[in-house]
Every structure is written in structure tokens, then in C-alpha cells.
Design a protein with these regions (language model features):
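Glycine-anchored, exposed beta-strand/edge motif detector
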Residues: 1-133
Length: 133
């Protein structure tokens, strides 16, 4: 189990060419450019599926470490996860997580992990997505 504000698991290095900083804890999708990522958002298929989480802020034009699978403990970002509850890609804010599945027509539901404690999660992105009609 990781200490507070820590990520443990399998990592990959990817580039940020979004024009802004990808912040620690944001989930990302792979863009159409090799090795580049951007914050995922469940309201459009073009910004999904999420496959990794930033383990630190990654400035525009920089390459950073992204968690592909593992455990995250962050008492400032995760304050109300439900033990055993599913965690989803947000449909309202790019890169964010949500404890509630997207429900509006045209949005995509992707389970990204499971709450292990109020401020800990198992990050385990599931790649099948369901489109809400």
C-alpha cells in the first residue's frame, strides 16, 4: 500500500503536447500522435479511453511518468471514495475522476478503478466502454 501522495505499480513515459500542464492525478488518453497523451473526458469518443494517470505535473512539451496499473493514495484528491465502489472517467472535467457513471446521451462509461479506502484506489482501467443512449 503506498504512502500518502504516492503511486505504486506499472508505469510508462508519455509526452504532453496539449498546450497546458497535465496535472498529477489526471487520467489521459493516447492521442493520434505517437507517444503523446491528453486528459480524457467521457463526453466524446475522441478523448477516450483513458489508459494512464499522471503521477506528477507534466508541463507542455515535457515527458512524464504515467501510472498504467497500480495503487494510488492521495488524501487531497480522493476524499470520498467508497470502499469497493467503481471509479469512472469524468464527463464534465477533462482528466478528472468521478464516483458516478456518466449518464447523458452520447457519453461514454469507462470504469477506471475501484475505491480501496476513502482516499485510496486501485487504478485498473477497463477498456470496453459503454455509450449512453
Amino acid at each position: 500500500e503506498p504512502a500518502n501522495d504516492a503511486y505504486t505499480g506499472i508505469y510508462g513515459n508519455f509526452a504532453n503536447a496539449t498546450g497546458s500542464t497535465i496535472t498529477k492525478g489526471q487520467v489521459v488518453y493516447h492521442t493520434s500522435t505517437a507517444n503523446q497523451v491528453a486528459p480524457a473526458r467521457a463526453n466524446a469518443v475522441g478523448t477516450m479511453p483513458a489508459f494512464a494517470m499522471a503521477t506528477a505535473d507534466v508541463a507542455n512539451g515535457a515527458t512524464g511518468n504515467f501510472l498504467l496499473y497500480g495503487f494510488v493514495h492521495d488524501s487531497s484528491a480522493f476524499v470520498s471514495l467508497t470502499i469497493g465502489g467503481e471509479v469512472y472517467v469524468s464527463d464534465t472535467t477533462a482528466g478528472d475522476l468521478d464516483a458516478t457513471a456518466p449518464a447523458d446521451s452520447g457519453e461514454f462509461v469507462q470504469i477506471i478503478g475501484m475505491g480501496m479506502h476513502a482516499d485510496k484506489m486501485l487504478f485498473n482501467p477497463q477498456y470496453p466502454m459503454v455509450k449512453v443512449d
